[in-house]
Amino acid sequence: MDEFQRDGTNHRSWQQFFLYPLFFREDLYAIAHDHHLDRSSSSEPIEILISNYFSFLTVKRLIRRIRQQNDSIGLFGNCDPIQFIDRNRNSYSEPVLEALTVILEVSFAMRSKHFAETMSGWKSIRSIHCIFPLIEDKFPHSNYISDIRVPYSIHPEILVRTFRRWIRDTPSLHLLRFILHEWRNSFSAENLQKALVVPRENMRLSLFLWNSYVYECESFLVPLLKRFYRSRSLLYGSFPNRTHFDRKIKHIVIFPINISTKRIWLLKDSFIHYVRYGERSLIALKGTHLQVKKCRYHLFHFWQYYFHLWSQPYRICILELSKNDSFFLGYFLSFKIKPLVVRTKMLDDLFITDLVTNELNPISPIRSILLFLAKEKFCDISGHPISKLSWTSLTDDDILDRFDRICINLFHYYSGSINKDGLYYIKYILLLPCAKTLACKHKSTIRVVREESGSELFTKSFFKEQEFISSSFSKTRSQRERFWNSDIIQIKCPI
C-alpha cells in the first residue's frame, strides 16, 4: 500500500489516467487476498483456502473476457451478467472486489488529501464527540438549522459519472461499470443503510462508494457555502421616493419617524456552518426564513443538476433554533435563550448592558435507551428487569464485565447531557437484570446475590471511570457540568 502511494506521489498521472494496469499486478491481489483471509473465520489451512478460493490466472481471464465482451453490461446488451459471472463467483468475486477497492482507495486518498490542502478551514475528525463542541460554539449564533439526510439510494450510472471526474482511462471505467451493475443489489438503499449503522467488512466497497459520492457532493457544496459566507450584503434602507435616487441619497441624513418603522434591512453578516456524520448533515444559518428557504431550494437543484439525483423534500427540514429540537448522534439538541447582564464601569460612569444568547442543552433520550434495552431483553417497555438467560453459561466475572461495559459506554457517550439523573435511572435498571441473571445461574434469589456481591455488583470499572473524571476536573465544579470525550470513535456495546 505504501509503495503504491509513493509511486502515485512521484507520478501523479497514473491515478487519473492509468488505473487499469494495476488490475494486472499480482502483489495487489495478494494484498486483497490477505484482507479476505484476515477477516475469514474459517479454520481450514491457508493452503487449502488459496487453492480452492483464489486463482490469479482466473482473475486475468475474467478481466480479459470483460474487456473483449461487447455486450457484457445488461443496460447495453441482451446477455445476463449474473449468469455470465456466477459460474466462477466463488473463485474470483472477492479478490476482484478487494483489488478494486484497494485501487480506488489509494487514488481517492491522494485526491482527497490534495483537496484538503487547498481548502482552508476544512477539518475531518474521527471522534464523534468532537462535533459537539463545534455545535456548542458556532450554532448558538445562528437562527435556523437545516437538517439534511444525505441520499443513500444511488444508481450505478451516477457513481460512474462521479468517477469520470477524476478517472480518465476508459478500460477502468468499463470494468467499474460492469462490477457496479453486477453487484448493484449490494449498493441498494437498504444494504447501505445497514452498513452505515453497523459497518461490516464485507460492505467495504459499498461504504467506500457511498463516502466517495458524499465527498464529491461536499467538494462542490462547501466552496459554494464559503462563497456565500464571504459575499456579505451591505446595509441599506427602503426609500419612499426613488426619483433621482443617486442625487438624493447624498443629502439624506436621518429618516423621518413615520418612515423608520418601514425600514427594511438586509443581512450584513452571514454565518454558515456545516457538520456531517454518517448520513446526517446539519447546516446552521443566520438569516431570515426566506433566505433559508432559498438555501433549501438551491440544495434541491444542486443534487438534481450536478448529480442527476432527485431528493425528496422531507429530507431537508428547516428548524428554527429557539423553537425546535434536533435529534443528532443520539442527542436531542435544544437551544434555550440565556439572558446575561454585563456591567462596565468607566471612570465614574456605570454602563449596564443586557445580552441575550443561545445556550446548547444536549439531552440524552432516556425513553429511546429504555426501548433499546427492552428490545435486547434486559427489561420490558415499562422498565421491569428481565434476566439474560443466554448469558447464564458464562462465568460470573464475564457477566459482571458485560453489564459493566454497557453502563460505562452509556455514561461515557452521554457525558455531555444535562439530564444525568436519567442515566442513573438506566444504571439502576441494568443493575437488577445483572443480579437476576446471576440468581438464575446459581438458582438463588436476587437478595442473596446482592448480599454476597454487595457494592461490587458491576461497579469496579465504573468507579475507576468516575475517579478519572473527578481527578481531571476541579472539585469546586458542579457534578452536573457537561464534558465531551474526544477519544470516542465507535461505541461497541457487548450485547
From Swiss-Prot:
InterPro entries assigned: Domain_X (IPR024937), Maturase_MatK (IPR002866), Maturase_MatK_N (IPR024942)
A Gene Ontology term for the protein's cellular component: chloroplast
Keyword set includes Ubl conjugation: no
Main location: plastid
Record GO terms (molecular function): RNA binding
Keyword RNA-binding: yes
Protein name, entry field: Maturase K
Keywords, alphabetical: Chloroplast, mRNA processing, Plastid, RNA-binding, tRNA processing
Protein family: Belongs to the intron maturase 2 family. MatK subfamily.
HAMAP family: MatK
One GO-annotated biological process of the protein: mRNA processing
